Amino acid sequence: MPSFDIVSEVDLQEARNAVDNASREVESRFDFRNVEASFELNDASKTIKVLSESDFQVNQLLDILRAKLLKRGIEGSSLDVPENIVHSGKTWFVEAKLKQGIESATQKKIVKMIKDSKLKVQAQIQGDEIRVTGKSRDDLQAVMAMVRGGDLGQPFQFKNFRD
């Protein structure tokens, strides 16, 4: 029986490349001359720390980072940015978290959405991914289109497509 897995993963190497590209752009931009502004990627906690001298500049840096992530194939919705910007001494910073895996509430929404579609497929939650199986390849492709079209707050990838 054909099946596939729905996952939400961020390639950390591509994220590192995007952070490096954003750092290079900040070094060459005129509005960031003589300003302490930086990006730091922490592989262990999967966070990106954005640091600058004012809250306005932190927001500009986040826009640059989102653009560079998008160029590297990582959607902006995979970056979880908290609302509050922390002020410490003379610097402002924010720690944006890269979303890895699908949360259980989102998993339940996806499974409910698949079951409500009345397609002849089964969806099973397996850890932080969802396995979808069905008899028809067309039904599985319809599920893929439905998950892509649904506004669930994070990007999804499909892997392990088997016949």
Curated annotation (Swiss-Prot):
The keyword Transit peptide does not apply. It comes from Escherichia coli (strain K12). One of its GO terms (cellular component) is cytosol. InterPro entries: DUF520, UPF0234-like_C, UPF0234_N, YajQ-like_sf. Composed of two domains, each centered on a beta-sheet, connected by two helical segments. GO terms for biological process: DNA damage response; response to hydrogen peroxide. The gene is yajQ. Nucleotide-binding protein. Binds ATP, GTP and tRNA. This is Nucleotide-binding protein YajQ. It comes from the Bacteria. The lineage of its organism: Bacteria, Pseudomonadati, Pseudomonadota, Gammaproteobacteria, Enterobacterales. Disulfide bonds: none annotated. Monomer. Belongs to the YajQ family. GO terms for molecular function: ATP binding; GTP binding; nucleotide binding; tRNA binding. Gene3D superfamilies: 3.30.70.860, YajQ-like, domain 2. Keywords: ATP-binding, GTP-binding, Nucleotide-binding.
